[in-house]
Amino acid sequence: MNRSTHGGAVVFRLTRKGPRYLLVEAAGTRDRWVFPKGHVEKRETAAVTALREVAEEAGVRARPIRRLRRVEQKQEGDWISIAYFLMAYAGRATPLEKRRIRWLSFDEAIEALDLVKSRRVLRSADRLISLGTGEEPTRNRIRRALARFAEWLVLGALALLPRRRSRGGRTKSRVKRAAG
């Protein structure tokens, strides 16, 4: 059993509707979507391989941001180690391979990826992108919105508490009295 090293990329571009992720159709298949990736050539790093594969497979230029994670998986009986990198879309390039590409939202990409490990890589990318844009990761947006709503309700309820008069004729809220 052989072991080989690959470089892969999660390429994203920011749109008004949020980040969109690049997926390419897997070689020799129909409607199986994957991240661009390929075998590390001699005298090449995994990051350089990932950049090359993005250009060759998808016809996209990208700017590396950081390494995401390494994934070990079995492919055609051999183990491969894939180092994934987060990359930002930087324009079009001339593709060397005839593959279909798709730019998908987080939810669409999760649905399109069939490997659990690829989904984990996408979740890591989404988390990092959301930190950089100030936007919450997709799966936490509802939870955060509910927390903000609950906080708003509590603050609103505190504002409705009756005020009491102090000896000097000024009013004090119950919040200040409880805190003081």
Each model region followed by its residue ranges:
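Flexible domain-boundary/linker segments
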Residues: 26, 67, 71, 102, ...
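N-terminal strand-loop-strand
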Residues: 1-35
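Feature targets compositionally biased, intrinsically disordered low-complexity regions
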Residues: 7, 17, 27, 76, ...
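Unchanged
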Residues: 39-124, 153-164, 178
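Charged phosphate-binding loop/patch that engages nucleotide di/tri-phosphates or the phosphate backbone
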Residues: 117-180
